[in-house]
Amino acid sequence: MSTLVSLPTAAPAPDYQSIDRPLNFSVAAAAKVRELIQEEGNADLALRVYIQGGGCSGFQYGFEFDENRAEDDLAVATDGVTLLVDPLSLQYLMGAEVDYTESLTGAQFVIRNPNAKTTCGCGSSFSV
């Protein structure tokens, strides 16, 4: 004789648009983006961060300036500067921080990604 057991259903995943800040865009990164936008002379630009296949670890980060925000893009604003992320990339970037660092070896945008299981030495590719 078998018994039918009703299991509780899982709560639906939160909509990324409803999460306060699913991705952190640091003040240092926003300041550098503002400087670069001023050099371009186009106040409509935002920095887009995205994930694509490639690199030595399977996925790699990409950055580009973009004037167009898609309806389903996440927009994170810091100090009046906007960072855009598409939903596909966001699933790999939830909880990450986009920062800008300067050191003796150079200056660069850095992503600190808690979802990355491994990263390559240059920090521009990762695996999940």
UniProtKB/Swiss-Prot annotation:
Swiss-Prot/TrEMBL GO biological process terms: iron-sulfur cluster assembly
InterPro entries: FeS_biogenesis (IPR000361), FeS_cluster_insertion (IPR016092), FeS_cluster_insertion_CS (IPR017870), FeS_cluster_insertion_RrpA (IPR023063), HesB-like_dom_sf (IPR035903)
Signal peptide: none
GO molecular function, one term: 2 iron, 2 sulfur cluster binding
Membrane-spanning parts: none
Binding of iron-sulfur cluster, residues: C56, C120, C122
KW Metal-binding (keyword) present: yes
GO cellular component terms listed in the entry, alphabetical order: cytosol
Cofactor (UniProt): iron-sulfur cluster
Disulfide-linked positions: none
Co-factor remark: Binds 1 iron-sulfur cluster per subunit.
Keywords: Iron, Iron-sulfur, Metal-binding
UniProt cross-references to PANTHER family, sorted A to Z: IRON-SULFUR CLUSTER ASSEMBLY 2 HOMOLOG, MITOCHONDRIAL
NCBIfam families, A to Z: iron-sulfur cluster assembly accessory protein, PRK13623.1
Assembly, per entry: Homodimer.
Family affiliation: Belongs to the HesB/IscA family.
Biological role: Required for insertion of 4Fe-4S clusters for at least IspG.
Name of this chain's protein: Iron-sulfur cluster insertion protein ErpA
Provenance organism: Xanthomonas axonopodis pv. citri (strain 306)
Lineage: Bacteria, Pseudomonadati, Pseudomonadota, Gammaproteobacteria, Lysobacterales
